């Protein structure tokens, strides 16, 4: 029971934490083209930006926003069911931690797609390679990537 509470709390922490950051970015970082919309963090290793992603990862599907939103909602719903089923079983905390990270990120990005009609991305890596430097992420993206890895490792046990 304690583990279930911890994992549900993790989902909520990711969702509300990322939502708070996204709202702050929308409020305080100017839109691209309307002033300085990039701030350096950690000595320039990270860049804080404001980017509206109307598709999926790397803006894929941006011309089919409705389809992207429906797929996002459907996958999030399935993931929610799998997550709650996993909470009813003993053991395999690695799988549950991965699912919690995935679900927190999925809730946040799906919420954006449905509410704002775009996902707010705000972090880039301050590297010399322009291909990587121009990609903009958010906390939920990192949680989804790490969560998928942990869930896969947890399923391999």
Question: Regions from the language model: what does each represent?
Answer:
Residues 1-157:
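Alpha-helical transmembrane bundles and membrane-interface segments of multipass inner-membrane proteins
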